[in-house]
Amino acid sequence: MRVGIPTETKNNEFRVAITPAGVAELTRRGHEVLIQAGAGEGSAITDADFKAAGAQLVGTADQVWADADLLLKVKEPIAAEYGRLRHGQILFTFLHLAASRACTDALLDSGTTSIAYETVQTPDGALPLLAPMSEVAGRLAAQVGAYHLMRTQGGRGVLMGGVPGVEPADVVVIGAGTAGYNAARIANGMGATVTVLDINIDKLRQLDAEFCGRIHTRYSSAYELEGAVKRADLVIGAVLVPGAKAPKLVSNSLVAHMKPGAVLVDIAIDQGGCFEGSRPTTYDHPTFAVHDTLFYCVANMPASVPKTSTYALTNATMPYVLELADHGWRAACRSNPALAKGLSTHEGALLSERVATDLGVPFTEPASVLA
């Protein structure tokens, strides 16, 4: 199979969808790998590195898209790429379709067979391709939150860990999944007072046991959430419903009662965001004001640390890439139910029930295209 990797086009997206190790394994198995020249530069992977591993360097994105049977990306296609989508091609990438009717329509209109990293799901409910980026985003959320709490950045002027005689920052994390756990872990390590809210008691129990009570846990009710948000210096939203739009848990009316200069970091922005006032931002302009608070809603947070996130992502994706390349999408999905969970579109049919519900688009059972 011919596998193509174009340069990422999203704002300040420095990751790349394959490493030289992945190229070497694909070519060892007899596959061709086409990589757009310069695709790895943001992750400090040179064209020479890719070429030495067996890749063929291609001058333009158009050529990669046109020639590849299996196209690997990190982030969803942007509007400028919609015209490159085509029938008969497999697209394997993060998609987050519930938050983008335009991208969904482009995939359906083109007939592309698309598989979303974020909805590949093992029988135990784990999300193996989303997890590494959730780890990165969670850890970054505490860091960028601490940075934007500085008065020079528009925040409250609070130091995360405080100093002797002065209290630390009050950090509230909504969601105790992979991203929320990692955000809480880093915030706790920085010396902040951390409270995590979730409706999953088992996750709260795990946090309590691991951190010996140093991280406070609360069952997430409207009452507890309101009280926690009002007193917080930093709120990190880390709520996930796999494949679906994130629920809006923090209203603008609640934000109006927060401390002036409080910071809200919305990790869930890829799925529409879990704060009512959230809208996607970029690294060029990462924040905006809502009432007297500061919202940070960068939709590709792990892109800022590509030397970490490219390798973390490709370590997880490569086993699935090899299955797709070796066997084709249909046979790979038949033999691997986790991969089949990621099926999103095929020949104009929408195969994700949650996306169909959120966007009001007809749903087709994935089993019907796997038969």
From Swiss-Prot:
Mg(2+) binds at E323, H327. GO terms for molecular function: alanine dehydrogenase activity; metal ion binding; nucleotide binding. Binds 1 Mg(2+) ion per subunit. Pfam families: AlaDh_PNT_C, AlaDh_PNT_N. The keyword Nucleotide-binding applies. It comes from the Bacteria. Its main location: secreted. Keywords: Magnesium, Metal-binding, NAD, Nucleotide-binding, Oxidoreductase, Secreted. GO terms for biological process: L-alanine catabolic process. InterPro entries: Ala_DH, Ala_DH/PNT_CS2, AlaDH/PNT_CS1, AlaDH/PNT_N, AlaDH/PNT_NAD(H)-bd, NAD(P)-bd_dom_sf. It catalyses: L-alanine + NAD(+) + H2O = pyruvate + NH4(+) + NADH + H(+). Its cofactor is Mg(2+). The active site is at H96, D270. It is found in: Secreted. Substrate binds at R15, K75. Pathway: Amino-acid degradation; L-alanine degradation via dehydrogenase pathway; NH(3) and pyruvate from L-alanine: step 1/1. Its EC number is 1.4.1.1. It is an enzyme of class 1 (oxidoreductase). NAD(+) binds at residues 134, 178-179, 198, 203, 220, 239-240, 267-270, 279, 298-301. GO terms for cellular component: extracellular region; plasma membrane. Homohexamer. Trimer of dimers. Catalyzes the reversible reductive amination of pyruvate to L-alanine. However, since the physiological environment of M.tuberculosis has a neutral pH, it can be assumed that the enzyme catalyzes exclusively the formation of L-alanine. May play a role in cell wall synthesis as L-alanine is an important constituent of the peptidoglycan layer. PANTHER family: ALANINE DEHYDROGENASE. Belongs to the AlaDH/PNT family. This is Alanine dehydrogenase. It comes from Mycobacterium tuberculosis (strain CDC 1551 / Oshkosh). The gene is ald.
